A protein has these predicted regions:
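Loop segments that connect adjacent transmembrane helices in multi-pass transporters
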Residues: 130-136, 209-257, 331-332
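ABC-family ATPase nucleotide-binding domain "signature/switch" substructure
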Residues: 442, 447, 458, 476-479, ...
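Juxtamembrane loop-to-helix connectors within ABC transporter transmembrane domains
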Residues: 103, 123-168, 226, 250, ...
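ABC ATPase nucleotide-binding domain helical subdomain, centered on the C-loop/LSGGQ "ABC signature"
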Residues: 424, 431, 438, 456-499, ...
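Transmembrane helix-loop-helix hairpins at lipid-water interfaces of multipass membrane proteins
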Residues: 26-91, 174-179, 186, 289-295
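Helix-to-loop junction immediately C-terminal to a conserved catalytic motif
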Residues: 413
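Cytosolic ends of transmembrane helices, especially the final helix of ABC transmembrane type-1 domains
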Residues: 232-236, 260-263, 308-337, 344-345
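Transmembrane helices of ABC transporter permease
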Residues: 25-31, 158-209, 279-294
Length: 583
């Protein structure tokens, strides 16, 4: 992604409507800043009134207040001022609570929207992308990187608030003591700029390292949970716990470094502010000047410091935090900038509508001069492949492990794009009308993916409850030789099967995958070693059902056992990148 400004990057993650809302938030922040300034600036008159009431008549603010409220008695004026300050602080803090809620909802809403947009982007990336990237990277981008991006947005909001408060308070102090204010502000500004220039690269590097460690921590969890059965059988729990903990220690080291880099400025700013004010006192004492003349100035600086030091510290910490989190924002913008995804809901694939609207079509499948090489590999997996699958027939594909059988099927499915050649269905290239092709195929892999939902939801995967046709679910289950088993369950189709179907046997999981492929009544059915996990008797029953379907569907079957494909109309062998017909 080309270099973009921070503003341009933020525009990428916000829809137009939310950008307008952000502008509205800016004006709301301005109002909050005025309240914060009033809360601090009204304290000084009260302090002056308590310290030297006899000098009040010389104060411009007192004369102005006296015009509005013509009160001669100073005690009454003191009471009015106290009540006014209390009222301002009540309003200020109520408004601050309101702004906190508004900002929190704004950030949470857009955080979720951006995460959904990134998931949409990842779902639209080509299959080769997912072959080359670990799922932990995807999880990090959607969760951790998006959180970093919106932490930056939150930091910018805080920067605006504290920056405006600081400017107003500095202006206020300039009126009180010009040279002292300029001296302190100049010192703080020089220190902040120098410190930021020194630590900026270190913070960015820490942010990059943190992202890498986050991936390793997520990977340790995913691998441990994903292989929990084998892990427990082998007694290797400690390995995965130690792997996570080791990366966790590295993460702690980074956070410690960040705490040091972010914490030092806060303490030094406090030292500079206190040293500046007390330095004035020291100079006055050294010159034997009357200290009573600077009591008012000291009071003003002391009161302003209540808000000024936290604001200055927050500005410094915010700028450092933005540098640390910038790698996360950059990653989010790069994903969006790839243009793999579009706005949520626009140009989205609606498989339900396709399945309802398509007409049944029996047509030949022709693979012409097909060649394919995986990215980062030199030798082609398949070379100059030519196959014809007649409509309504079943074709078996055999070959040793790693020969390229699954790659061939992935190409015909349209998951992979060949470097040479084409695949035709009914004389039309499947890539020219891929959505129509998708609506006509059913796929049964060797390893079935199952969600921690009901049997119904797993058969009709990806559909909302109101879209599911139970009659079609039962028909698909019956065709997969699983209907009787499900009818015997207490909750029937509503039975929860656990994550990855842990409450089912291997054969039952496989048959749910078969039922899923049959739910949409596809024209072409692909079985990628789909019966490998079944016992011989069940495999024969399932294949009998598949063979019965082959009279009305085209079936392409990958298998290791020749008995699985003995009833196929044709058999092809994949060997050394070539495909030859054996029968």
């Amino acid at each position: 992604m080309e270099q973009k400004s921070l503003f341009a990057k933020l525009k990428m993650i916000f829809p137009k409507k939310e950008r307008r809302y952000f502008v509205l938030l800016f004006f709301l922040i301005l109002i909050g800043t005025v309240f914060e300034f009033l809360g601090v600036s009204l304290i000084l008159p009260l302090v002056n009134l308590l310290i030297s009431p006899e000098q009040l008549s010389d104060k411009a603010w007192y004369r102005l207040l006296n015009r509005v409220l013509p009160i001669q008695d100073q005690n009454t004026m003191l009471l009015v001022l106290v009540l006014l300050i209390i009222a301002v602080y009540i309003v200020k803090n109520l408004y601050a609570i309101y702004m906190s809620v508004v900002q929190g909802v704004f950030l949470a809403r857009n955080r979720v929207n951006t995460s959904a947009k990134l998931l949409d982007c990842f779902m639209r990336k080509p299959y080769t992308f997912h072959l080359q990237h670990n799922s932990a990277e995807v999880i990090r981008a959607i969760n951790s990187d998006v959180s970093s991006a919106y932490d930056i947005v939150s930091s910018i909001m805080n920067l605006i608030t504290n920056g405006l408060i600081t400017i107003l308070l500095i202006g206020y102090l300039v009126l009180v003591d010009f040279w002292l204010t300029i001296s302190i502000v100049t010192g703080l500004a020089l220190y902040s700029v120098v410190y930021f220039l020194v630590v900026r690269k270190k913070l960015k590097a820490a942010g990059e390292e943190s992202r890498e460690i986050t991936v390793r921590m997520i990977k340790a969890i995913v691998q441990a949970v994903g292989g929990i059965k084998e892990v427990k059988v082998m007694g290797r729990e400690r390995f995965f716990v130690d792997s996570y903990a080791e990366n966790g220690e590295s993460f702690v080291r980074i956070r410690r470094r960040l705490s040091i880099l972010s914490g030092v400025p806060r303490r030094l700013i406090e030292i500079l502010c206190v040293a500046g004010v007390l330095g004035l006192v020291a100079v006055k004492i050294a010159l034997r000047q009357d200290l009573s003349a600077i009591v008012g100035s000291l009071s003003a600086f002391a009161v302003a410091a209540i808000k000024l030091m936290p604001s200055a510290n927050s500005i410094n910490a915010t700028i450092n935090g933005i540098s640390y989190r910038m790698p996360g924002l950059n990653a989010v913008c790069e994903i969006i900038d790839d243009n793999w995804g579009t706005d949520i809901g626009q140009a989205a694939i609606d498989s339900t509508a396709r399945a309802r609207n398509r007409e049944r079509k029996q047509a030949d499948i022709r693979v012409e001069n097909l060649s394919f090489t995986y990215p980062e590999m030199d030798e082609p997996v398949l070379h100059d492949v030519n196959i014809t699958v007649k409509a309504g027939t079943s074709v078996g594909i055999v070959g040793v492990t790693g020969a390229g059988k699954t790659t061939l099927v992935d190409l015909i499915l349209g998951l992979l794009e060949p470097q040479q050649g084409r695949i035709l269905y009914g004389g039309e290239d499947i890539r020219e009308n891929y959505e129509d092709w998708q609506a006509r195929i059913g796929y049964i892999p060797q390893n079935i993916y199952l969600t921690d939902e009901s049997i119904r939801a797993n058969v009709a995967l990806g559909l909302y409850a109101e879209q599911i046709d139970d009659e079609k679910v039962w028909k698909a289950l019956d065709d997969a030789q699983l209907g009787d088993f499900v009818r015997g369950l207490k909750n029937g189709l509503d039975t929860k099967i656990g994550e990855m179907g842990v409450r089912l046997s291997g054969g039952q999981r496989q048959r749910i995958g078969i039922a899923r492929a049959l739910y949409y009544d596809p024209d072409v059915l692909f079985l990628d070693e789909a019966t490998a996990a079944l016992d011989t008797a069940t495999e024969k029953a399932v294949m009998a059902a598949v063979n019965a379907l082959s009279r009305e569907k085209t079936c392409i079957i990958i298998a290791h056992r020749l008995t699985t494909i003995e009833d196929c109309d044709a058999i092809y062998e994949v060997k050394d990148g070539l495909v030859s017909r054996q029968r």
